[in-house]
């Protein structure tokens, strides 16, 4: 599995995301159901800023008024074509005013960033959060990390905790989902989840 030319900013990367999420067996089995349930449990009806929204897999199931942001313009267009509100990073950060959100989701974003750059990427979005907003950070465990050539740095719970603290957030909870932590070496879709508050 090769890294698409242009990495995660390329149209090829968007096509790869669409092909992976559109696999017939995944749709028939609704493999995303437990992950949607988990996000709803964590974010409830909060208007959420989905940073690194990709093609909108999570954004499509977030509450009304939620917005996606991604650095890949092709992925943002896929979201818009699906009726979702999404912006490129430059569009969102360059807008007039500062809309406020009650939640922020960064799911499967941080592991794609160059080592040490996660705080710099996420920090500009923190001022868009209301006081006490919920922040959810999600990264793959070992097997999931190895499944994508665009993953650059393995981010575990201590690294997520350090990132949250660097962003000035208060950590509420950290856990493995959907299976216990030891499954992360075998199950591609096991995730590290960190929940924090602004």
Language-model regions, residue ranges each:
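Conserved N-terminal segment of class I S-adenosyl-L-methionine
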Residues: 1-99, 103-105, 122, 128, ...
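Short catalytic micro-motifs in class I SAM-dependent methyltransferases
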Residues: 108-112
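A short, conserved alpha-helix within the catalytic core of class I
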Residues: 113-124
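Conserved beta-strand signature within the Rossmann-like core of class I S-adenosyl-L-methionine
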Residues: 132-140
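Short "lid" loop at the C-terminus of a central beta-strand within the Rossmann-like core
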Residues: 140-145, 179
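Acceptor-substrate binding/catalytic loop of class I
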Residues: 144-159
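Conserved S-adenosyl-L-methionine
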Residues: 169-180
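Core SAM-dependent methyltransferase catalytic element
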Residues: 180-198
């Amino acid at each position: 599995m090769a890294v698409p030319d242009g990495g995660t900013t390329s149209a090829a990367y968007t096509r790869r995301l669409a092909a992976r999420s559109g696999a017939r067996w995944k749709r028939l089995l609704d493999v995303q159901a437990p992950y949607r349930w988990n996000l709803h449990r964590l974010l409830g009806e909060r208007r959420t800023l989905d940073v690194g929204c990709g093609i909108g897999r999570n954004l499509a199931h977030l509450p009304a008024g939620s917005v996606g942001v991604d650095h890949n313009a092709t992925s943002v267009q896929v979201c818009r074509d699906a009726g979702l509100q999404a912006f490129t990073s430059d569009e969102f950060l360059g807008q007039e005013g500062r809309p406020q959100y009650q939640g922020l989701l960064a799911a499967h974003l941080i592991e794609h960033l160059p080592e040490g750059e996660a705080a710099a990427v996420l920090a500009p979005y923190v001022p868009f959060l209301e006081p006490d907003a919920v922040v959810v950070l999600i990264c793959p465990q070992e097997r999931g990390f190895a499944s994508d050539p665009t993953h650059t740095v393995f981010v575990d719970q201590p690294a997520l905790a350090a990132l949250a603290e660097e962003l000035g957030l208060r950590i509420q909870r950290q856990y493995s989902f959907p299976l216990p932590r030891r499954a992360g070496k075998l199950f591609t879709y096991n995730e590290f989840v960190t929940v924090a508050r602004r």
